[in-house]
Amino acid sequence: MRFDVNQLKWTREPAEYEISSDKIEIITKPHTDLWQRTYYHFRNDNAPVLQMETEEKFFSFTVKTEFESKHRFDQCGVVMYLDSENWLKGSIEYENERFQHLGSVVTNNGYSDWATTEIDAGIKSMWYRFSRREDDYCIECSEDGVTFKQMRICHMWNGGETIQFGIYACSPEDSSFKATFTNMEITECRWLAHDGQQPDEE
């Protein structure tokens, strides 16, 4: 399997974007977001998502993001969007001039779970690596594209068969910014099988 922009399909195609063989740019629209129910008690499902489809059970997808975010919750990153109630994403969400949230959201059966850590607001580029091992998934991040750090390991209840994965960008509040995606690559699964305690017998 290889990453081919000609295989990408939009869910909610944005008004402004450019796609070439090695770069994708998205201009976000205000009040676009992905979130389901938890804490905020709203259901937002209108962010543009650009993905390819696969039945491959073991692989990794890497992408570099660059962004001009400037307003609270502006974000772009890697995503696996199955439907409105089952998806996961990894991104940086801008907060203020001091810090932003590097984090991931896992949404299973209509409830979102957000895990974050604060990073400096001056960071305007981040690499992500999305890996699949059957119906388990891992998201990692890197500032240089070489050394990746684990952000999230999760199970997706509806992620065991054919999936869609790719990129997204959105501005949940009254804002707009440009998100740029480059260095998109699919490789063998870089998230290696666990080499410690053996699995329990089913």
Predicted regions and their residues:
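Extracellular glycan-recognition regions
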Residues: 1-202
